[in-house]
Curated annotation (Swiss-Prot):
Protein known as: Probable metal homeostasis protein bsd1
Bilayer-crossing regions: 160-180, 233-253
A Gene Ontology term for the protein's cellular component: Golgi apparatus
Lineage: Eukaryota, Fungi, Dikarya, Ascomycota, Taphrinomycotina
Similarity-based family: Belongs to the BSD2 family.
Keyword field: Endoplasmic reticulum, Membrane, Stress response, Transmembrane, Transmembrane helix, Transport, Vacuole
Source species: Schizosaccharomyces pombe (strain 972 / ATCC 24843) (Fission yeast)
Key word Amino-acid biosynthesis present: no
Length: 277
């Protein structure tokens, strides 16, 4: 009750001309009033401030109509037909916004630029005169290891000594020697020698497992549970070893034939396609 009394004390009395319009205006003002008295009207209650400005303009206009014209001797009071609509005049003068619903009809104004420049592509002479920007090129510099070296697939062929050396190291140091020689070798024959050493190591391990499977244990009893599995694993190792030997042998022969074919191309004689393959 105290809030409503404070809010009603803010408004000035509205003349009863016309009655229905004053009643509607008072209800509209009550609808847009802020909930508290200490709220700033201009910032936190824009709807209330715009409605209040519109109501005050209406009240001033009604008071102007009800007062007699001093230039009129008959004391005639102006009627409502003599007034000018305040909404259009206020909008034309730009004093205040009539209501919140007037923003619905507002449209953004787009400034038309009549001096827009039409961009056109350059002519052929201008495009031809324009120099191309520089581009970075990647140049690979391969050191010269000698005129006798032949490279196949980016790696030199190698010699027979590297082949035998890699195979011996892979056999003397099983698995570890293969990894060292295969990773550190920079020639085709060196890597094939490491693979040959690995295949011979697998063949040797498989043969030992098969031979030990038929021997008696220390307690003079056969371990029948492990015999079939040990023979199977040994057989698989022997098969893998033989396959690696065949693959490495064919690879070694192919590299040697390619080396011979490339070396013959330096001579005046022609080589047949069969020799290259």
């Amino acid at each position: 009750m105290s809030t409503n009394s404070n809010q009603n004390s803010i408004h000035t009395p509205i003349p009863e001309f016309p009655e229905n319009r004053s009643t509607n205006r008072s209800e509209l003002a009550a609808a847009f009033e802020p909930p508290d008295d200490d709220v700033e009207y201009s910032e936190t209650a824009p709807l209330y401030s715009s409605a209040r400005a519109s109501i005050e303009g209406e009240e001033a206009f009604y008071q102007h109509l009800s007062t007699p014209d001093p230039g009129n001797d008959s004391g005639h009071v102006r009627s409502s037909n003599d007034r000018i609509p305040s909404t259009s005049s206020n909008h034309a003068d730009g004093h205040h916004v009539d209501s919140v619903f007037s923003n619905l009809s507002a449209k953004p104004t787009v400034e038309s630029n009549t001096e827009e420049l039409e961009e056109e592509p350059p002519s052929y002479e201008q495009a031809a005169a324009d120099t191309a920007p520089p581009y970075w090129d990647t140049t690979m510099v391969i050191p010269d290891y000698g005129s006798n070296e032949i490279y196949i697939d980016g790696m030199s062929v190698g010699t027979g000594f590297s082949f035998v050396w890699s195979a011996c190291v892979a056999i003397l140091f099983p698995f570890v020697g293969f990894l060292v020689t295969y990773v550190l070798s920079t020639t085709h024959l060196g890597r094939y020698g490491a693979q040959i050493g690995l295949s011979l190591t697998l063949f040797q391990r498989g043969y030992i497992m098969i031979s030990e499977s038929g021997m008696e244990n220390n307690d003079d009893q056969y371990n029948y549970d492990e015999l079939p599995h040990q023979k199977l694993i040994g057989s698989i190792l022997i098969i893998i070893g033989w396959c690696l030997v065949l693959v490495d042998t064919f690879g070694f022969i192919r590299i040697r034939r390619m080396k011979n074919a490339i070396s013959r191309t330096d001579s005046p004689g022609e080589t047949s396609p069969e020799e290259v393959v």
